[in-house]
Regions:
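Extreme N-terminal starter segment of soluble prokaryotic enzymes
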Residues: 1-5
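Conserved phosphate-binding/catalytic region of the ribokinase-like
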Residues: 179-263
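General beta-strand structural signal in soluble alpha/beta enzymes
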Residues: 6, 69, 123, 145, ...
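Histidine-anchored nucleotide/phosphate-binding helix
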Residues: 27-36
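Active-site metal-binding loops of divalent metal-dependent hydrolases
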Residues: 9-10, 230
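Conserved beta-alpha-beta core of the PfkB/ribokinase-like small-molecule kinase fold
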Residues: 120-184, 201-202
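Conserved N-terminal subdomain of the carbohydrate kinase-like
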Residues: 12-17, 21, 39-120
Length: 263
């Protein structure tokens, strides 16, 4: 059975207009969504000791994620402040990861052995694991990273040589700009898969240099929080599972689109 790990960020998303907080974070969301698809999933990250940390940890535990290698520190858990504009989530503030930034992950020998037991390790630009990427690359069979809307040249050059799948958010970019960005990412070292999500315009995915496109299934969204994470999760678990069986990606995608899930 496929096994996946979210490595890095966990936060609470504080909806300021409703005074409600929800568990989140790219790495944690990946693990949770995979678990919802019936995949064996774990999460490795840093928790604080405040109410937000307790809420996130308890939720992840209730969902039966493997949390056996997580770290715990005194301090404020990561949080993001959010508002909704016509169903589109807008980030208006954060504490930049809280304890995750103050006490970044340092992978031990036991951690590296742990990573080797997973088919996919997914992390993000918000996880403060850049220094650990060479070790993650050595330990894990398949490494994925969400770069959000980052176009910083130095940062991309630093991280991409260790990544099998890079995800970027391109909702405000033109098609030509996206294609150029995909090629740049490939030139900087991530030559296998690049996922470019475009919100209501669908997604572009480059697999070994071949470009695929998926049109969106348009809905009246009430909240777009986690939409990109769920797309990335669905794509990766279907892609890697198919490749383990040596099936061809174009055949696998078929009428299900590039995520492998029916619209």
């Amino acid at each position: 059975m496929l096994r996946v790990l979210g490595l890095g960020d966990n936060v609470v998303d504080k909806y300021m207009h409703t005074h409600t907080m929800y568990p989140g974070g790219n790495a944690l969301n990946f693990a949770v969504y995979a678990k919802m698809f019936g995949i064996e999933a774990g999460y490795l990250g840093v928790f604080g000791d405040d109410e937000a940390a307790i809420h996130v940890y308890n939720t992840a535990h209730e969902l039966r994620l493997d949390l056996s290698h997580c770290r715990f520190h005194t301090g404020e858990n990561g949080y993001a402040e959010v508002r909704l504009d016509d169903g589109d989530r807008v980030f208006i503030g954060s504490n930049k990861g809280g304890v995750s930034k103050k006490y970044p992950l340092g992978l031990t020998k036991m951690d590296r052995e742990y990573l080797a037991g997973f088919d996919i390790v997914h992390t993000s630009i918000f996880s403060y694991v850049e220094d650990m990427l060479p070790f993650v690359r050595d330990a894990a069979g398949f490494v994925s990273m969400d770069f959000s809307d980052c176009v910083d040249d130095a940062y991309l050059r630093r991280c991409l040589p260790f990544i099998d799948c890079a995800s970027i958010s391109c909702g405000d970019m033109s098609r030509n700009e996206i294609l150029n960005q995909i090629e740049q990412i490939r030139e900087y070292g991530c030559r296998h898969i690049v996922i470019a999500t475009r919100g209501s315009k669908g997604a572009l995915v480059s697999v070994d240099g071949t470009l695929y496109e998926q049109s969106p299934c348009l809905v009246a969204a009430t909240d777009t929080m986690g939409a990109g994470d769920s797309f990335i999760t669905c794509f990766l678990i279907n892609y890697v599972d198919a490749m383990k069986d040596a099936r061809d990606f174009p055949v696998v995608s078929g009428d299900r689109g590039i995520t492998g899930c029916k619209n």
